[in-house]
Design a protein with these regions (language model features):
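Extended, solvent-exposed polar beta/coil surface segments
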Residues: 1-230
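Structural beta-strand segments of beta-rich domains
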Residues: 136-138, 698-700, 712-714, 798-802
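Asparagine-centered strand-capping/turn motif at beta-strand->loop junctions
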Residues: 16, 702-708, 804-808
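Short proline/glycine- and polar residue-rich coil/turn motifs
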Residues: 166, 175-183, 748-753, 759-763, ...
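Surface-exposed beta-strand/loop patches in extracellular or lumenal glycoproteins
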Residues: 705-723
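Glycan-recognition and catalytic cores of secretory/periplasmic carbohydrate-active enzymes
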Residues: 56-57, 65-68, 72, 159-161, ...
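Extracellular/luminal regions of secreted and cell-surface proteins that mediate adhesion/ECM remodeling
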Residues: 568, 775-895
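C-terminal beta-strand-rich structural cap/linker in extracellular carbohydrate-active enzymes
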Residues: 745-782
C-alpha cells in the first residue's frame, strides 16, 4: 500500500518485479473526514446477530459462503429494516467459539422471500428491487467494539462489499482501524451501481481475537442512492470493462455452459450491462461474439460505392484498408521498443503471421517487415532458441510457436537473406532429433514434447499428432527455396510415413488415422479429420506432391474432398483446381454453393464462381462481407486487448485475388502466391484493386482498377511462376468487366521467382495484363546462390569487412564484393568458389575492402557478383546498403 498527497492528473507507472506478471487490480482511495450525502433516496438496515439469515433471496449468498469459505470463516448475520419479519436463531456458543474473526453481513434485496411456513408480511415493503436510481455508496456505523487493541492502540478491520451479481468480486476492499470502545461511521463511496434484484453481502474481518457476529450487533447500514442519470455512467463503464476483460480471458477456448464459472461470470456481466443499457453498441458487439452471432446481424454503417467505380474494386480496397488500420494499430499502440507486443512473444509470433501476406499485397511492406524483425530480435534476445528448436520443452504445436513460425514468416519478406535462411537451416537440421525412422521403417515424429535441450521419448510422448505438422514449415520453405535435399527428404518421408498407416474404415473407404505411435506404429483418435489440426497435415502432403509430382501424395487431398467436398481444400494456398486438373469436375458444386441465397455459402465458392463466370459481383460480395465484419469487430480485435494470438483481420480472400494465391495464413505453410506488389506511392496499395483469376505457373491474367486520380506504378515480383522468357500483353477494359480491349501492347521480358516487372496502372481505368511464358530456362531452385544481409557488414577505420554466404542448391562460383556509390565502382575484392550448404551448416567466406576518404557512406552500397555472371536463385540478396558507423571510425560497427 502506498500513500501520497492529493493530486490531480499525472501518470501512474507500474513496474513488475516478476517477468510477464500482469496487474490484477488497482485500488485508489481518497481518505478524509466528510459527511454522508443525503442522495435521492436511502434505505436503512440494522445488523441483528440473533436473527436467522433465512430469507430465500439470501440462499445464493449462503451458498457462496458455504462454498468459498472454510467452516471456521462462515459466521453470518443479517441486516434488516426495523419492521421486517424475523426469526430468532438458536444460540450455539460452542460453534461460535471455533470461528475466526470474520463475519459476513447479508442484506436481502426485498422482504418478499421469507422461508416456507412463515408469516407473510402485509401492507409494507422494503428493498431495492426494480429501483430506478443507482447506489452511490454505503454508510456503515460500527458500534463500539469491546475488544482489545492489537496494533498501536487500534483494531484493524478489513471491509469488503461484494458485487451483487458476482459475490466473488469486491465492489470495494478497504482496511481501516478503530479504537476499542469507540463507535465510528464510515462512508464508503462505491462506484455507482444500478442494482439488480440480487441481495447484498458485506464481509468484515478484524485483527482482534473475539471478533464475532455479536460484536457487530446493532451495526447500521445506510444505502444511499443517487439519480439514475448520474449513476448510470459508472455502472455502464465498469460493467463493460468487466465484460471486456473477462472475454479477453475466455476468447480462445470456451463453452457456453454456465457450469463453467468463468463463463457464468462473463454472462452475468454482459447481462447486467445490457439490462441497464440495452443499446450499448460495444456491448452488443461483444454479445454477438459471445453468443456466436446466433441472434441476427448487428447494424454496421457501411460506405456507398462511388459512381463509376466497380463494386468489386471498391469493396476490395475497403476490406484491405480495414486490415491495414488493424495492423497499424497493433504496431503503433502495442509494439514496444523491445520488439514485442505485450502478449508474450510466443503468442506475438502467431499475431505477425498476418503481416507477410499484407506486406506482399503492397501495404506498408517496410513497416511490417521492421515490425517482424523487431519481434525476432526480442525472441533471440530472450533466449527462446536452442540448437534450432525452442529452448523450453513444450508440446508439438507450441514448440513451433516459440519462434520457428516467426523465422519462417520472415523469409517471405526477406527472401534470400542469409541470416533468415541459415536460421531455418539450423531448425531443419534439428528435425533429425524429433523426426526419425521408427522400428517399422517409417519416418514419423518421435516425440510430441520436446525442445532444443531435451526430447522426451517415453511412450506417452511418442504419439505423432496432426498438430505436429506446422513445425515442418522451415523444411517446406527450404525445399522450395533451394531444393534442399534434407528438407525434401523430411517432407516426403513424413508423407510416406503417414501413408503407410492408411487403412479401410468401417464404411469401406480409404482413411488415415489421427495419431500414430512412433515406437509401435499403433494408431488412436479415429480418423485424421475427426480431431483438432487434421487439416494442417495437408500442406505437407501438398508440398511432397509439388516437390516430386508423384500422385500418391494426392490421396490425402482427395480423402479430404471425400469428407468435406472441394471446399475442404480452401485452406491450400495454391490454385489446386488447375494443378490437380479438377476445375471441370469440382467447380460446378462450388458455383452451386456460391449461388445459395441463404447466406451460408463460404468464401471459396464465391472465388471459384468468379473465376468460372467472370462475374465480379461474386468478389464484391466476399469483400463487402469481410469489410463489414472487420468494421464490426475492430474494437474487439484492438482495444479489446484479447490474447495477441486470438485477434485476426482475415486476408485469405484478399491474398487469393491480389497475389494469385495465398502466401501465408497461420499454419497454412506451403506458399501459393503467384506474385507480390510494391507501389511507388505507399498509399496506392489501398487505391489499386487487383484480381488474378485461375493463375498457373506458366500463365496468368491480372485485372486491376486504379481508384485514384493519378497513374500508379507498381513493381510486380514473381513467386509461384516458371522461370524463362515471358510475353506480357497489357491494355484496358473499357467496360470494367475484366476483358482486354483490342488495342493492347505486347512486350517480352525475363521473369522468374523473385524477379520484378514495373507495371503502370492508369487512373480511373481497369487495366488487364495477360502474361504467358514462351521459353523456359533453368529451374531457379537448382541454382547456386550467394548472399549478404543482416549482420554481414562491419565498417572499421580503414576497411569494410563482409561475410559472403553460399545459400544455393549448387556450388557457387568465385566472385567479387564490389563497393559502389552513385559515381560507380569504388573498390572490389575477390572471394573463392563456395560449396553449397548440403549438410545444413553455413558456408561463408570473409572479404575485406579498403575504405578510402573518397567513400561517402550514406550513399554507398555493396554488391556481390560472380565471375561468370552465373544465374542465381535470387538477386535480392546481392545488394546491401552500407551501414554508417554509429561511433568514431576507430571503432567497429556491426549492422
Amino acid at each position: 500500500m502506498d500513500q501520497f498527497p492529493e493530486r490531480r492528473g499525472g501518470t501512474l507507472r507500474f513496474a513488475n518485479t516478476a517477468q510477464e506478471t500482469p496487474i490484477q487490480e488497482i485500488w485508489a482511495y481518497d481518505v478524509q473526514p466528510g459527511q454522508v450525502p443525503n442522495g435521492s433516496a436511502q434505505l436503512s438496515y440494522t445488523v441483528r446477530s440473533d436473527i436467522q439469515p433465512d430469507y430465500d433471496n439470501l440462499a445464493p449468498l449462503r451458498a457462496v459462503i458455504a462454498g468459498r469459505y472454510p467452516s471456521g470463516e462462515r459466521q453470518t448475520v443479517i441486516a434488516l429494516p426495523t419492521k421486517a419479519p424475523a426469526r430468532k436463531r438458536p444460540s450455539d456458543k460452542a460453534a461460535a467459539s471455533a470461528q475466526q474473526p470474520i463475519v459476513h453481513i447479508l442484506v436481502p434485496s426485498s422482504l418478499g422471500d421469507p422461508p416456507p411456513d412463515q408469516a407473510l408480511m402485509r401492507s409494507w415493503s422494503y428493498g431495492w428491487e426494480n429501483m430506478h436510481d443507482g447506489l452511490d455508496g454505503i454508510a456503515i456505523t460500527l458500534p463500539a467494539l469491546n475488544l482489545p487493541a492489537t496494533h498501536n492502540g487500534s483494531i484493524p478491520l478489513n471491509i469488503r462489499i461484494k458485487d451483487p451479481i458476482w459475490p466473488a468480486r469486491d465492489m470495494i476492499d478497504v482496511s481501516v482501524a478503530v479504537a476499542p470502545g469507540q463507535a465510528r461511521t464510515l462512508w464508503l463511496d462505491l462506484r455507482d451501481r444500478i442494482l439488480s434484484n440480487d441481495s447484498l453481502m458485506l464481509s468484515i474481518a478484524a485483527a482482534a481475537p473475539g471478533f464475532d457476529a455479536n460484536a457487530l450487533d446493532g451495526t447500521q447500514l445506510q444505502l444511499v442512492f443517487k439519480p439514475r442519470n448520474e449513476a448510470i455512467k459508472e455502472h455502464v463503464a465498469d460493467r463493460f470493462n468487466q465484460v471486456k476483460d473477462n472475454w479477453g480471458f475466455l476468447v480462445e477456448e470456451h463453452t457456453t455452459s454456465k457450469r463453467q464459472l468463468l463463463y457464468k461470470r462473463l454472462d452475468a456481466d454482459i447481462t447486467d450491462l445490457l439490462r441497464v443499457d440495452p443499446d450499448h453498441a460495444l456491448g452488443r458487439e461483444y454479445w454477438n461474439d459471445i453468443s456466436y452471432a446466433n441472434q441476427g446481424t448487428l447494424p454496421v454503417e457501411m460506405p456507398s460505392v462511388p459512381k463509376g467505380v466497380p463494386a468489386w474494386a471498391f469493396w476490395q480496397l475497403q476490406d484491405l484498408s480495414a486490415t491495414r488500420r488493424y495492423i497499424r494499430w497493433w504496431i503503433e499502440q502495442r509494439q514496444v521498443a523491445y520488439g514485442d507486443f505485450g502478449g508474450g512473444i510466443s503468442d506475438d509470433s502467431d499475431l505477425v503471421q498476418q503481416w507477410p501476406g499484407v506486406a506482399l499485397m503492397g501495404v506498408d511492406p517496410d513497416m511490417l517487415n521492421a515490425s517482424m524483425l523487431a519481434l525476432s530480435d526480442a525472441n533471440y534476445r530472450n533466449g527462446m532458441f536452442t540448437n534450432g528448436l525452442s529452448t523450453i520443452e513444450t508440446d508439438e504445436l507450441h514448440s513451433y510457436e516459440e519462434g520457428i513460425n516467426l523465422n519462417s514468416a520472415l523469409l517471405y519478406l526477406n527472401w534470400g537473406d542469409p541470416r533468415t535462411v541459415e536460421r531455418l537451416m539450423e531448425t531443419v537440421k534439428a528435425f533429425d532429433n524429433i523426426i526419425q525412422v521408427n522400428p517399422q521403417g517409417h519416418l514419423l515424429f518421435a516425440s510430441n514434447w520436446f525442445g532444443g535441450r531435451k526430447v522426451y521419448r517415453e511412450p506417452n510422448w511418442q504419439w505423432q499428432k496432426p498438430y505436429s505438422f506446422p513445425i515442418v514449415h522451415p523444411a517446406i520453405l527450404l525445399g522450395g527455396y533451394n531444393a534442399d535435399p534434407n528438407s525434401r527428404r523430411i517432407v516426403t518421408g513424413l508423407a510416406d510415413g503417414y501413408l503407410a498407416h492408411a487403412y479401410t474404415n468401417a464404411k469401406g473407404n480409404w482413411a488415415l488415422p489421427n495419431e500414430i505411435n512412433w515406437q509401435t506404429g499403433k494408431t488412436r483418435g479415429g480418423e485424421l479429420f475427426e480431431g483438432s489440426g487434421g487439416a494442417d497435415t495437408l500442406h505437407t502432403f501438398w508440398a511432397a506432391y509439388r516437390f516430386t509430382g508423384e500422385d500418391r501424395y494426392l490421396k490425402p487431398i482427395n480423402y479430404r474432398v471425400a469428407n468435406s467436398g472441394p471446399n475442404g481444400l480452401s485452406l491450400l494456398n495454391e490454385n489446386f483446381l488447375d494443378v490437380m486438373g479438377k476445375r471441370s469436375d469440382w467447380s460446378g458444386k462450388l458455383i452451386d454453393a456460391a449461388n445459395k441465397d441463404d447466406g451460408s455459402a463460404p468464401d471459396f465458392p464465391h472465388h471459384v464462381a468468379w473465376e468460372q463466370t467472370g462475374n465480379l459481383d461474386y468478389l464484391a460480395a466476399i469483400y463487402r462481407s469481410e469489410a463489414r465484419e472487420k468494421l464490426q469487430n475492430f474494437y474487439m480485435n484492438t482495444e479489446g486487448h484479447w490474447w495477441s494470438d486470438r485477434v485476426e483481420s482475415p486476408t485469405v480472400n484478399l491474398q487469393r485475388e491480389r497475389l494469385g494465391g495465398v502466401a501465408l495464413k497461420r499454419n497454412q505453410t506451403y506458399p501459393g502466391h503467384t506474385v507480390s506488389w510494391r507501389f511507388n506511392d505507399p498509399e496506392a496499395a489501398t487505391q489499386v484493386a487487383i484480381a488474378i483469376p485461375a493463375p498457373q505457373q506458366d500463365r496468368f491474367t491480372v485485372i486491376a482498377y486504379n481508384t485514384s486520380n493519378k497513374n500508379q506504378r507498381a513493381s510486380m515480383t514473381g513467386w509461384n511462376v516458371a522461370p524463362g522468357q515471358w510475353r506480357i500483353t497489357q491494355g484496358v477494359s473499357k467496360g470494367n468487366d475484366g476483358k482486354l480491349d483490342s488495342n493492347a501492347k505486347t512486350q517480352e521480358v525475363a521473369f522468374e521467382k523473385s524477379a520484378s516487372i514495373d507495371i503502370d496502372f492508369p487512373a480511373g481505368r481497369t487495366t488487364v495484363l495477360q502474361l504467358e511464358r514462351i521459353a523456359a530456362t533453368t529451374p531457379v531452385e537448382l541454382r547456386p546462390d550467394l548472399g549478404i544481409g543482416h549482420g554481414d557488414v562491419r565498417v572499421t577505420a580503414d576497411a569494410i569487412e563482409v561475410t559472403v554466404h553460399s545459400l544455393g542448391h549448387a556450388d557457387a562460383p568465385a566472385g567479387f564484393v564490389v563497393l559502389e556509390d552513385t559515381r560507380g565502382e569504388l573498390a572490389r575484392s575477390a572471394f573463392p568458389a563456395l560449396a553449397a550448404p548440403r549438410n545444413l551448416q553455413p558456408i561463408t567466406t570473409q572479404v575485406r575492402l579498403p575504405l578510402t576518404n573518397a567513400v561517402t557512406l550514406k550513399t554507398a552500397r555493396l554488391r556481390v557478383l560472380t565471375e561468370s555472371n552465373a544465374p542465381e536463385i535470387t538477386d535480392l540478396n546481392n545488394k546491401l546498403a552500407l551501414p554508417t558507423p554509429a561511433k568514431p571510425a576507430t571503432a567497429k560497427n556491426s549492422q
